[in-house]
Curated annotation (Swiss-Prot):
One of its GO terms (molecular function) is DNA binding. It comes from Phenylobacterium zucineum (strain HLK1). It comes from the Bacteria. Disulfide bonds: none annotated. This is Integration host factor subunit alpha.
Length: 100
C-alpha cells in the first residue's frame, strides 16, 4: 500500500497478498465488513476494534454559529456525527512510526 491514502482497492489487494483469497473474494470480504460497520452505526451502536479504536455516533446540540462570508449569526441545528477514537495501542504505534 503506497501513497497518502489507503483505498478499498488497497485493502483488498493487501488481503489478497497476505491471506491468499481471490481478489473477488477479498473485495466481497472488505465490502461486507464495511457494510456491517455501517449497519451498526446506523443502529446507534459503537463499533469497537480492539487495538485499533472505537467508531461511534455522537449527538451535537444546537448552537449559534456564524456565516463565514457575512459574519451574520446563524443557528446550527442539532445533528449526529460519526466520531472515531483511536486506542492507546494505535496511538503509540502511529507515534512510534512517525517519530522515526
Amino acid at each position: 500500500m503506497k501513497g497518502a491514502t489507503v483505498t478499498r482497492a488497497d485493502l483488498c489487494e493487501a488481503v489478497h497478498e497476505q491471506v491468499g483469497l481471490t481478489r473477488q473474494d477479498c473485495a466481497e470480504l472488505v465490502e461486507r465488513v464495511l457494510e456491517l460497520m455501517c449497519q451498526a452505526l446506523e443502529r446507534g451502536e459503537q463499533v469497537k476494534l480492539s487495538g485499533f479504536g472505537v467508531f461511534q455516533v455522537r449527538s451535537k446540540r444546537a448552537r449559534m454559529g456564524r456565516n463565514p462570508k457575512t459574519g451574520e449569526p446563524a443557528a446550527i441545528e442539532p445533528r449526529r456525527v460519526i466520531g472515531f477514537r483511536a486506542s492507546q495501542v494505535m496511538k503509540a504505534r502511529v507515534d512510534q512510526a512517525l517519530s522515526r
